[in-house]
Curated annotation (Swiss-Prot):
CDD domains: IHF_B. This is Integration host factor subunit beta. This protein is one of the two subunits of integration host factor, a specific DNA-binding protein that functions in genetic recombination as well as in transcriptional and translational control. One of its GO terms (cellular component) is chromosome. GO terms for biological process: DNA recombination; regulation of DNA-templated transcription; regulation of translation. Heterodimer of an alpha and a beta chain. PANTHER family: DNA-BINDING PROTEIN HU, INTEGRATION HOST FACTOR SUBUNIT BETA. One of its GO terms (molecular function) is structural constituent of chromatin. The gene is ihfB. Belongs to the bacterial histone-like protein family.
Amino acid sequence: MTKSELIERLAGQQSHVPAKVVEDAVKEMLEHMAGTLAEGERIEIRGFGSFSLHYRAPRVGRNPKTGDKVELEGKYVPHFKPGKELRDRANIYG
């Protein structure tokens, strides 16, 4: 599901709320979450999961076109850990 599909689906479920208001709310929520992570803070949504930053250590990578070795710096990357409730709902084959 893309962001625009999410907005469309939410707007359809909330017919009393204009689609533009739903779009603005979704965009603002995602922007706020990204800003919170950029400040190094963790986000926890009970029953859904948590977002945090994980550190990736420096390493030697390869340029896919040339095969040359490339030194990659350490960096922080976003990480999502699903909550138990979400894991249980997503486990449709278990």
